[in-house]
Amino acid sequence: MTTNLLDFDLEGLAAFCEQLGQKRFRATQLFRWIHQKGASDFEQMTDLAKSLREKLAVSAHIQGLNVVSRHESADGTIKWLFDVGAGDVIETVFIPETDRGTLCISSQAGCAVGCRFCSTGHQGFSRNLTTGEIISQLWFAEHFLRKHLGRNERVISNVVMMGMGEPLQNYSQLLPALKVMLNDHGYGLSRRRVTVSTSGVVPMIDRLAKDCPVALAVSLHAPQDALRSNLVPLNKKYPIAELLEACTRYQSAAPRDFITFEYCMLDGVNDQPEHARQLVALMKTHAANGLSCKFNLIPFNPFPASGLLRSDMPQVMAFAKILMDAGIITTVRKTRGDDIDAACGQLAGDVQDRTSVDQRMAAQRQGMLGGIKVVVVNGDTA
């Protein structure tokens, strides 16, 4: 059996090349061919010696995932279904904007967290994806889109680990994939443009801060433990206080000076004025310990098994106003891709909004945001 080179970060690929009797710099050449040029045939790699190409041909391969289907939304959003074997499929979503392209990547086939408002969680958990299966989504999408859009430059500028699965419950495979995304010989993405979204796996938030601090988004969805435990069962193990303490620790290492909290707006469940006021009190308590945050309010995308309904827009905007009046940066999601079931919650999380807010965050810390209006956004980190 040969080795799939998509399973390696650069360090792993260098070790593999050494096993073939090659110097480590050959791994950099090989890495560039795979990730920057999208090569899958060693004979394309003309700056590698023929003897090395022959060794690679008998010991390795470059194999992405098989595409089951591709769906394109009226708004330009593209969703792919990939076959990962044993009857499992995963979903990957590309969200185009005028100044950026965001890819939402899955980390697991299914999800074990079981959030009430997420259709993937209702499907149950099958297995973790390998590093190669995670990075294959980016590898395929980037090079497909270059051809599809007729572009010779990078199309995907931002990656969000917000597709199917809880990324931090697949940490050993996630970490090398993140390193490939960030490596200048791979995709060269900045840490600010790669976001890991988590439902709150506290020990792994601390590990990510140490190993590979990228932008962090946390699925909060409630201001107090009883309600959050009902919506996000993982809260029973890692309650809100522990989660926010971990977020404060993470912030000291993070590439951005704030943590994004995702909040799915559920009619009559977590969208009342008292919930907003409880959030304000909660954030003020932790701000005293150094936590800076941004809230992203997400209109719920209903599905039959949930038994939940979407908050109407006036209720969402009233909720946002309470947060904003308290000086908390707040955005409201504009749904994308819902006509192809690619919107938030129809996979396993947030796929769109990581808007650039550096100046407003600085103003928030100075308590200057009382009169700023709520912004409806649909982009990714600039």
From Swiss-Prot:
UniProt-listed GO biological process terms: rRNA base methylation; tRNA methylation
Its source organism is Polaromonas naphthalenivorans (strain CJ2)
Any Gene Ontology CC annotation: cytoplasm
Disulphide bonds in the chain = 104-344
Q: How is the cofactor bound?
A: Binds 1 [4Fe-4S] cluster. The cluster is coordinated with 3 cysteines and an exchangeable S-adenosyl-L-methionine.
**Which compartments is it annotated to reside in?**
Cytoplasm
Q: Which Gene3D superfamilies match?
A: 1.10.150.530, Aldolase class I (3.20.20.70)
Under which name does UniProt file this protein? Dual-specificity RNA methyltransferase RlmN
InterPro entries xrefs:
Aldolase_TIM, Methyltransferase_A, RlmN_N, RNA_MTrfase_RlmN, rRNA_lsu_MTrfase_RlmN/Cfr, rSAM
Q: Which domain of life is it from?
A: Bacteria
| Residues the record marks as active site | 91, 344
